[in-house]
Amino acid sequence: MAEEIDTKEFAWISEVFKKKKVFTGLSYTEREALIEDMYKISYKPEDIIFKEGDDPTACFLIYKGKVKGTKNKMLVLKKEVSTLGPGSFFGEMAFLTFAPRVATVVAEENMVCFVLLKSTFQKLLSKNPAFKSWLKSLSAKRLIKLNSL
């Protein structure tokens, strides 16, 4: 169930945004507006956050806990592509490529994430072409790396 973000969490997200390369092209006001549109959600171990092939609707910032990303190889094999913990973003690549999810992401332990909806992210990209261009470049590099696994 979705919950509102409290003051302490807002400050934590703001600090993460300041340190993440992906948000350096945004003004303070743009970063704060993004945070105001986010919400908090909790997951239990083995909860599937999204599956490879799903349409993207949100990206996630891990506050507590860990996730594991896997990619299908052939029909029955799965390859672990990443394990992410607090302060990590995931799911944003699909916003830029307009393609389905490229991996399945599952909670490895009890976790809390902050969620940013695709509609909010797209609104920001339309207002900031330089940021959009930079993110597309970053996304292309990540996609090449992922497809080589």
What role is predicted for each listed range?
Residues 1-149:
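Cytosolic regulatory regions built on CNB/CRP/Popeye-like sensor folds
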